Amino acid sequence: SLMVSAASVASAGPIDQARQLYNDGDYEAVVEKMRPVVKRSPRDGNANYFLGASLYALGQLDEAVKPLETAEGRGVADAARILAIMALDRYDASDASKHIDAWAAALTKSKKPKSEEFEFISRRAIQLGNMLDRVECIEVIDSINVDSATFFEVYRLSSAAGSLLPPDAVSRLGAGGDANELSVAYMPENRSELLWAAADTSGCFNLYGADILDDGSIDHSTILDDALREGGSAQFPFLMPDGVTLYFANNGENSLGGYDIFMTRRSDGDGEGKEYFQPQNVGMPYNSPYNDFMMAIDEASGLGWWATDRNQIPGKVTVYVFIPSQMRVNVEPDNPNLADIARLSSIALTQKEGVDYAEMLRTHLPGRNDAGVTQSASSPAFALDMG
C-alpha cells in the first residue's frame, strides 16, 4: 500500500502532493516540494499555506510567518488559524484577534461553519487579553526541571504547610480508590482531613475529601463540589492553614489552556456541609496556555511553589519557587516586558536588583521535605496524565 500511496502522490499535481504528504506528517518533504512552487508563484495561497504550515509543524516559526500571512491574505482559513495560535503562544492578544477576524472572514466566504476550535481559540484570545491586563508582580527565585512522575517531591514544605502525599497514599490510608486514578493528595498539619482527586466513570477528575477520625481511620469520602471542575477536570488540591483557602487546578471553561491554577474559599461548615465559592483563576504569570498546577504556599518559610509543563521538556515539568505577596500588585500594562513577564521567559525579569536569592533560598527552605516522610521505594510511579 505504501507503493500505491507513493505512486498516487507522484502522479498528482504539486499541491495535491503537498496535501497528501502534509496529511502523512512528512513536513520536510512538503517544504522541499513547496519552496520552488512558492518561488515561481509567490501569491499562490495553497502553496504558501502548505509551506508555512509545514515550517510551523517543524518548529521553524519565524520562517513560517511570511508564507502563512500570504496564504491568509489569499483567504486560506487554516493559515489564519495557525497565525492566531502562534500569536496566542507569543501572548500577543491583539495580533491573535486580527488573525481570528481573518479566519472568520475566510470561513464566511467559503460558507463553512465556525468549528469548536474556532470558538475555543476566540475565547482564549479574549481571556489572554483580560489576563494581560492584570499580570501579578511576583519574585520567582528559582526554577527546577524535574521528572513529571515525581514532581511534588521537590516541594520543600515546612510541617505547618501540611504534606503532599503520593497517589497511592489515599488507598493506603483507607480512603479506597484505585491508586492509578489518583492525583497527588494533601493532608494539613493537624491531620484532620485528606484531599485528593479521582476519576469518575466518564474519566473526568473530581476533588474529593474525607475527614480523618480521632483513631486515625478515614471517614467516608465525598466530592468537594462538582462545580469546581467548571466542565472539565479538577486536580491537585492544596489547603492553606486557614482551613478556608483552597488552591487547585482545573482544565474547564475558564482555563487559558490545559490545566490552570484556581483559588476558591470554603465555608466553615463540617464535612458535606462545606460550601465552595466560585473559583477564581489566579492569572499570570502562574497560568499559561499549557498545564499549570499544584500551587502550594508555605507561610512559615515565606515561599510558594507551582508546577508547569509550559517549557515543553519531554517527561519533565518545571517547578517555580516564588515569594508570595500579602497584597496583589500588578505589572503596569505599558511595561515593555509585560508579555515576557507573563510567560516567564526569564525569571530574572521578576527579580529585584541587589537581592541574593540563592541566600534567600538557603535560609528560607525547611531542613527536610515533609512529603518524603510518607514516600517509600515501594510507592508506584505517578504517571502525570494531563489529558
List PLM regions with ranges:
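Short, conserved micro-motifs composed of acidic
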Residues: 82, 89, 93-95, 106-387
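Alpha-helical segment of the N-proximal tetratricopeptide repeat
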Residues: 13-41
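Start-of-helix register in tetratricopeptide repeats
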Residues: 46, 78-80
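Short coil turns that delineate tetratricopeptide repeat
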Residues: 42, 74-76, 108
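Structural motif corresponding to the intra-repeat A-B loop/turn of tetratricopeptide repeats
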Residues: 24, 58, 90-91
